[in-house]
Amino acid sequence: MRYLIGIDMGTTNVKALLFDEQGNTAGEARCPSPITLLPDGGGVFDPEELWRLCCRLLTELLDAAPAEARSRLAGLAVTGMGEAGVPLDAAGRPLYPVIAWFDPRTEQYPAWWRDTFGEDRLYAVTGLKNQHIFTANKLLWLKEHEPQVFGEMRRWHCIPDYIAFRLTGASAMDLSLATRTLLLDAASGTWSRELLAHAGIPADILPPAVPSGTKVGEAVSYTHLRAHE
């Protein structure tokens, strides 16, 4: 019997679940998400705190798991909140707190897209009616209000693929999350150079968009997880 781990990086809770190939639960660990709520109704997360919490939950999960499960782990998948993400520098270090998906600081940008690009064209490319929550609007906010961070950024990861990156060293984004960036060409499933150029966002900061279930790399060892609790 092989075992699998699922991680859910949620806005309210972070959860790790161990289960067998028949879908039977063999273990669970959870903890409230470390969000800092702001007076204006926004919120932020510390990327390093999210990573440490993930390591702690995985350690708790595996410490309590049967020895058979620990020796027969076949895979690990990460899901979680959409739209929010982490700007990383050339060394893969976080440059700025995670802006929560619901944070209102980006409310001005749907009007910018409407006036400079057009709602109909935006919908034709992305399949989305623009809202302030989408990732592209967070990148526009960083470009306008944190130009040094924007200039030093070499990669943008949404939260689930940031955790996958920390676990594996591999850079990729699930297509379902990529659709929530407002930067994906929905017809081709690739990043829209038209939208990126219009927004002044470098195309190479976005990781490859891959289908759910794609193997992106090998996860770190149990010992490595314990060292990062």
State where each predicted segment sits.
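N-terminal glycine/serine-rich phosphate-binding loop of ATP-dependent small-molecule kinases
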Residues: 1-96, 124, 152
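Short beta-strand-loop/turn "lid" adjacent to the catalytic site in phosphate-handling enzymes
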Residues: 65-101, 129-135, 164-185, 210-211, ...
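A short alpha-helix-loop-beta-strand transition element characteristic
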Residues: 68-71, 78, 120-130, 148-157, ...
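Polyanionic/metal-chelating signatures
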Residues: 142, 163
